[in-house]
């Protein structure tokens, strides 16, 4: 049996509309155990780094398995999430990139830009993303280990 994911979702005000739609899909997905929303709400203007870092920290702390983050471009939340030790986040707006995000890079965080892709594509990509699981015995595992090794060096 495949493990279900504990997913955290978040956005800034530029991604709020998509976050709400995507959250509903995640909550009904059979690959999802739970969904935690770290903001924002309809009236908030929380800066995207706060939301992205909170979501990424939940993964780093073992409280979530994956995060889906949305801002205007998807780039700001990816950069912010990547500042949390142990997190690999990337923006992906096509099926192949979503697949490789997990299978080649073991990234836990997928980010979207509400101003970049349509909602139907975002829904499709989020659903696909939940079907992928990183294989620790794959050829990519050594490359991911090198990233982790560098991250853990005393600098």
Model features per residue range: what roles?
Residues 51-91:
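Helix-adjacent hinge/juxtasegments
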Residues 32, 63-65, 106:
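Short, high-confidence coil segments that cap the C-terminus of an alpha-helix
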Residues 17-28:
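Short, solvent-exposed amphipathic alpha-helices that sit
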Residues 10, 35-38, 67-71:
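Short, conserved beta-strand edge motifs with alternating hydrophobic and charged residues
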Residues 3-17, 95-155:
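C-terminal binding/interaction regions
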Residues 33-45:
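A short beta-strand-loop structural module common to alpha/beta enzyme folds
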